[in-house]
Amino acid sequence: MMMIRAGAPVDEMIQELLPHLEPGDVIIDGGNSDFRDTERRVKEVEARGMLYVGTGISGGEIGALTGPSVMPGGSPAAWPLVKDLLQGIAAKLDDGTPCCEWIGSGGAGHYVKMVHNGIEYGDMQLIAESYFMLRKYGQLENDEIADIFAGWNKGELNSYLIGITADICRVRDTDGGYLLDRILDIAGQKGTGKWT
């Protein structure tokens, strides 16, 4: 299983791995690969007699500690071989059900991860715009905005992103000012938002 930068590094790693693999072996790509690249890789690896699983993984730091959501897709014959492994590392629902199920063939796993990221980025944009409106036009202080977000988080808008936004609105820097007021209004992205 590899979790490396998407694009050429994945292709390079596959080329390094292939001479050491036997027919029926499985390569799992757990990075944020473009689903179209995964489609191509599935075909290329299967042509060599091996199996390829493009796996979307979500959960960040908390997922690293408690288990991520795992979205595998690729060579269908690989699922019985990797199911126990992937479901074993996945987060679990209260009833023990793993947050991992076979998504489909080809690039399906990475496609679902791309859509997941696109929705998350859209949510983050809405939260950022809400903050901007409350701060600039509502003339509210960050503590007041934090109270509003915390209130929203108790109702139908309850989400991890709104909760952490409420928390960060309250954080002060070493000079006693709001940390948010020192953060530049710029952001980068890894590609999945653009692909969506």
Region annotations inferred by a language model:
Residues 1-3, 26-31, 71, 114-115, ...:
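Short glycine-rich or small-residue beta-strand-to-loop segments that form or flank ligand, phosphate
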Residues 32, 121, 185-188:
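Residue-level marker of alpha-helix boundaries and capping positions
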